[in-house]
């Protein structure tokens, strides 16, 4: 059942985003779809389609691993790619997440920093 829920979430989120954007355009039919896709991403309709694809991948990852694990992996990858600890801490501070998750992200950064030494 978990696999089914993950697939529904991965397919459902981009669809929901598109439906909401179509509703926000105030248009109907093909014009609504065109306007919604153009509004979703950079570069017009093609960018909107790409944005929905990326949104699908992200939502599938969140459904499979959880938001905490995804955020933690991103913080660790930023460090491995050479970003400074200070710049990563600034990014963590700006993330729209709970204080508890920010604390865990800082702890993840500390652990990976200790392993690198």
Task: Tell what function each PLM region has.
Residues 4-70:
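Small-residue-rich hydrophobic membrane-insertion segments
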Residues 62-117:
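Amphipathic, membrane-inserting segments
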